[in-house]
Amino acid sequence: VWTLTLDTATPYLALGLFRGEEGVGRVVRVERRHEEALFPLLDDLLAEVGARKEEIGALVLGEGPGSYTGLRIALAAGLGVALAQGARVYGVNSLLAACWPYLEESGPPLTPLFTARNRLYYGATYTRQGGRPLELLPPGKLRAEELPPTGLLLDPPPDPRALYELLPFAREGVEPLYL
């Protein structure tokens, strides 16, 4: 059984297929063309790992924050695949998925930022303790003068493998984070 990971909250399309230690993920900057690129890329990934859509048993979807339309694309596509395959759906915060690969155990906190409108940023602050993510500042809209002085990651793409690695901490179901 494969797990499909998908995030379209940012200008990037993050898509992956994972099973245990094996799997592949791709991050492609598509700006506002997520819907055009998503299913052809999924077909490519399925071919690369030698799997069929029927073998997808779980989906981990990025819940945002981010582009309203982008969030809806991942949710609609992901829920459609889940319904067709009878797969379970889980949600993970997109900011956490973007910084997870850079968080070191008991290391300094990181604040991933996605550029929002009106000179604002979507941001949150995280650290890793005991192998688990720890949220120090909940997701919200921030002005430049509100940003912490260190540990900033500006517009990192959500990571497909991080979405998979965060599955043990994910909540079943998905709830978009519109800020």
Question: Predicted regions span which residues?
Answer:
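Phosphate/pyrophosphate-binding loops at sites that engage ATP/ADP/AMP, CoA/4′-phosphopantetheine
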Residues: L42-A58
